[in-house]
Amino acid sequence: MAAKEVKFAGEAREKMLRGVDILANAVKVTLGPKGRNVVIEKSFGAPRITKDGVSVAKEIELEDKFENLGAQLVREVASKTNDLAGDGTTTATVLAQAIVKEGAKAVAAGMNPMDLKRGIDLATAAAVKDIQARAKKVSSSAEVAQVGTISANGDSSIGEMIAGAMQKVGNEGVITVEEAKTAETELEVVEGMQFDRGYLSPYFITNAEKMIADLEDPFLLIFEKKLSGLQPILPVLEAVVQSGKPLVIVAEDVEGEALATLVVNKLRGGLKVAAVKAPGFGDRRKAMLEDIAILTGGQVISEDLGIKLENVTLAQLGRAKKVILEKEKTTIVDGVGEKAEIEARVAQIKAQIEETSSDYDREKLQERLAKLAGGVAVIRVGGSTEVEVKEKKDRVDDALNATRAAVEEGIVPGGGVALLRAKKAVEALSSENPDIAAGIKIVLRALEAPIRQIAENSGVEGSIVVGKVLESEGNFGFNAQTEQYVDLVAEGVVDPAKVVRTALQDASSVASLLVTTEALIAELPKKDAGMPAMPGGGMGGMGGMDF
């Protein structure tokens, strides 16, 4: 086991704080409509330009092990917020930095870290409750567009495009973002289907950066039983190899020899293949496999129908323009099924929905209907250069996540105002214990951090903006884009309540743990053993010398 270095108390916190500051300072320049870009060096290809907080956070790795520990913990805040809400990563980072800074000062002044944490947790819970109470449900397409626009850094065309996509496939519909081959950004609604099963083995991945298997124009083998032996599928595999097209296998399970053979063939490049478990269970699985077969113009290969796997021909396989397999979901885009058959299936499911008395069955049937009839909306992001396309795609992804979050939990005034207004709820808290009271005050100060940063990124003094916004009530706040004090909701400057709430909860959770840290342990750098011994003769004695 390698030797470790340990740092305690003040020295540990100081190092950790320095790491937190380096990461947070790099991330927070991107906050708000007038936030700046960050350029990230890539080991190959052009540098990446981004205004996406989590992309910046993920790139930062510090040389000093102890500073790096602090930076990694704040990176965790950004990643977790991104996973849960899909946006708000920069806000979460700014909040975490503010709580850690104030908390470290309080600990240095001799306060009890555990009581400080209790105060921070109490204040966070009160602020979250206030944010949820202020949330206003999103009803119109225009409001959806506003949320998307703000999250895409004021790009109204992106906001309108996402609102259009949601209108076409419904709020629950599937919307994917791709890079376009042209300079234009466009929206296309493709008939497709998504289900919640992912690839059976990570070896099927074709795009390592996104961790997905992306197969163009594949055949689909839809089999209702388990596949474990290799012999039954050999004829169909050989036919697919000769056709030169990829193959997607949808079956109850693929295991043993069959899975091993598919993986080996994929790795050797002989056959582009991916396997996925069939969605659903029991009778519902059969019905969903039938849906996939109708959508792709294939047949469900079932022993009940007297079709043996050994005798399957290419004509019995489904076809689609594209199949994308992720870790936990699969999307089939543009199946070649007959329109009349798909419509007949949709009518059949609608009839079943009307007949069923079980709420659970009705919900599952509606899900199947949405998958068959709703389709998949694809936003193709275009630009003049690859760098521009990547930067814009980051913003479209953020905007899409923010819009989904807004539909889920409603919207609050943007520009850091919802957090600032939550101060009132936190001020109402009190505690006999002075250290818990100090923890509450830490959150009170931290709630101002995002609006200050947005103002400073716009070239305006943060404290003046905070003072002016606190003089008023409700949705009144600072619009950094126009540098005016206005009713933010009326102007369309809104944030999803879920994003603001998640950012605060994640920041407070990690930052309060940092405040209670008393020791840091990191591995010592390995020392070079020096030059190897030289062969006998001339300069033989140099082997052990240290350079």
UniProtKB/Swiss-Prot annotation:
It catalyses: ATP + H2O + a folded polypeptide = ADP + phosphate + an unfolded polypeptide. It is found in: Cytoplasm. Pfam families: Cpn60_TCP1. GO terms for molecular function: ATP binding; ATP-dependent protein folding chaperone; isomerase activity; unfolded protein binding. GO terms for biological process: protein refolding. Forms a cylinder of 14 subunits composed of two heptameric rings stacked back-to-back. Interacts with the co-chaperonin GroES. This is Chaperonin GroEL 1. The gene is groEL1.
